[in-house]
Regions:
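Canonical positions in the second alpha-helix
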Residues: 31-32, 65-66, 99-100, 134-135
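Register position in tetratricopeptide repeats
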Residues: 18-19, 52, 86-87, 120-121
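Canonical tetratricopeptide repeat
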Residues: 45, 79, 113-114
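Alpha-helical segment of the N-proximal tetratricopeptide repeat
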Residues: 5-35, 45, 51-52
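Single-residue signature of alpha-solenoid repeat helices
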Residues: 25, 59, 93, 127-128
Length: 137
């Protein structure tokens, strides 16, 4: 796929995304080799499209490409943690959670991620409540 074709497809895909036509946008996204794309924002948008369609593994894979290009991004790490849980990979979610708390030790979103992990692990409700109470502080 040449640059012109890539540009046309991505513009059309983003227009469909803005209109809320995520299924059609995902069909266009499937035609592009995202490993060659360096634009982090584009990769995050594609990940959003796949996530809205319930294609969590594709969303996770594309977001992982963005992570490799911008390793210090709290937003990407947070979303990777959530997507890892949605794909049933709790161990990876814990790894991303640890990365997130190292990068942003004072970010209150860490408590939401902790709660999501505890919930996925079916931890006692007291522990889950404790994580949410920490967020509330």
């Amino acid at each position: 796929m040449d640059k012109y074709e890539y540009k046309l497809k991505t513009e059309q895909m983003l227009e469909l995304m803005e209109e809320g036509s995520y299924r059609k946008a995902a069909e266009l996204a499937d035609e592009i080799d995202w490993r060659k794309v360096r634009n982090i924002t584009m990769l995050m948008n594609v990940s959003d499209i796949y996530e809205k369609n319930g294609e969590y593994q594709k969303s996770y894979d594309v977001l992982n490409l963005a992570y490799r290009r911008a390793e210090g991004s709290r937003k990407i790490i947070s979303r990777l943690c959530t997507l890892a849980l949605k794909t049933g990979n709790v161990d990876e979610a814990i790894d991303y959670y640890d990365d997130f708390t190292q990068i942003a030790p004072k970010d209150p979103n860490q408590y939401i991620l902790r709660y999501q992990i505890l919930r996925a692990q079916r931890a006692p409700i007291e522990q889950q409540i404790e994580a949410l109470e920490e967020y509330k502080k």
